[in-house]
Regions:
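Juxtamembrane segments at transmembrane-helix boundaries
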Residues: 124, 190-203
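Juxtamembrane/interface alpha-helical elements of multi-pass membrane proteins
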Residues: 8-97, 105, 205-308, 318-321, ...
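Membrane-proximal, non-transmembrane alpha-helical segments
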Residues: 116-144, 318, 326-348
Length: 377
């Protein structure tokens, strides 16, 4: 009884610590989201500056791009409101602060260029090149972190037969082994799929409504695995049902992620092709008619007809919005060429990340299934 009380006390202390750290965690999470969207923001900004837009007009347009930049559009809106209050856009940029020191430095650099009265497009282009390199490095580090977590979880699952043999030899209970193994499998699966292009995928409202159900199932698996207040561990059939539910609920999101990755490849090829044709003197409408890539042809048709596009990838969303600006302003292919470069770098960074984590996704599903089958032996 005293053992259970000690566990409850430790859980309460851990909960208090987590609640105290929650504001810091939320701030760091927002900073990470801003840094992930920074290359898209700079590319979006540069394309419009190259098309002859003023910096204020480009920021106002960015503030309206909620789907393309879920975090950065709010910062752009705050900058515009601060500039209106002060009557000075460059001053607002110079003094603006964000949760990310890197994003704050970039905005200040743009503000310095605007303060001098020079065209900020060149400075934005240089900043964009730096951010493309940084985004690729960040994707590599995220893959390594996820791999480390996945390897630790896999080690636990690999040692499960040893745990079984050890406890059986000494006459111990096997009750804790299977919940630990299943939770380890869930951890590995989460680590592998959570980073597969999600920052540049636009999930539909239908899939977003499924995410709370997935979190509820994971919370249920954790809750029934903690032996508090004398609560006995559940039958393995419950874990089997939870695992099946997670797999079933992940199917729609996995389908949209695969579609988004396919759109990303078609998106940067589309931008490169159109930029080349425009630089060679092809009319914009004629260039649209020459697009034959099935991954993007429907979205291009929508843009050409003035219908709102609905891409699953933020990268393709960026390309399509730039195409629309180029078409309306007649800016030529240079702006589109820079956006094509950004789109290509984003695609390759997250494609490599996805391929490295796919192995752990498959292993975690297989291991979790095998362990649940073993529980009936």
């Amino acid at each position: 009884m005293s053992f259970l009380l000690n566990i409850n006390t430790l859980m309460i202390i851990a909960l208090i610590v987590l609640l105290a750290l929650l504001p810091v965690a939320l701030r760091k999470e927002r900073a990470a989201r801003l840094e992930e969207e920074l290359p898209i923001f700079l590319s979006y900004l540069y394309a419009r500056l190259e098309a002859g837009w003023s910096l204020r007009k480009a920021l106002e347009a960015a503030a309206a791009e909620k789907a393309l930049m879920p975090a950065f559009h709010q910062e752009a809106g705050r900058i515009i409101r601060e500039a209106e209050r002060r009557g000075d856009l460059s001053g607002a940029l110079l003094d603006y602060r964000t949760p990310s020191a890197r994003v704050t430095s970039v905005l200040r650099s743009i503000g310095e260029e605007a303060f001098t009265g020079f065209d900020p497009a060149t400075r934005v282009q240089v900043l964009l090149w730096d951010e493309e390199e940084y985004a690729a490095e960040r994707a590599r580090k995220k893959a390594e972190s996820a791999e480390n977590l996945a390897e630790a979880s896999l080690m636990i699952m690999i040692l499960i037969p040893l745990f079984i043999s050890f406890t059986a030899f000494f006459g111990g209970s096997l009750e804790l082994i299977f919940p630990i193994a299943l939770l380890s499998s869930i951890t590995t699966y989460t680590a592998s799929v959570a980073l597969q292009g999600v920052p540049i995928v636009i999930l539909s409202p239908r899939v977003m409504r499924i995410l709370p159900a997935q979190l509820a199932l994971i919370a249920a698996a954790i809750a029934i695995s903690i032996p508090v207040r004398g609560f006995s561990l559940a039958n393995p059939m419950i874990y089997l049902g939870i695992g099946a539910g997670l797999v079933a609920l992940s199917i729609p999101a996995s389908h949209e992620v695969r579609k988004a990755i396919s759109e990303m490849e078609g998106g940067h090829l589309l931008a490169q092709g159109l930029a080349t044709k425009l630089q060679l003197g092809y009319p914009v409408e004629r260039s649209f008619q020459l697009v034959r890539d099935g991954r993007v042809v429907e979205q291009v048709r929508r843009v050409s007809l003035g219908i709102e596009a609905n891409p699953r990838s933020r990268q393709l969303h960026l390309v399509l919005s730039t195409i629309k600006v180029v078409r309306e302003s007649g800016a030529g292919g240079k702006a589109l060429e820079i956006v094509a470069r950004t789109a290509q770098r984003l695609y390759h960074a997250y494609r490599d990340l996805r391929s490295r984590l796919r192995f752990y996704e498959v292993i975690s599903i297989t291991a979790g299934s095998l362990i649940l089958i073993m529980s009936f032996a």
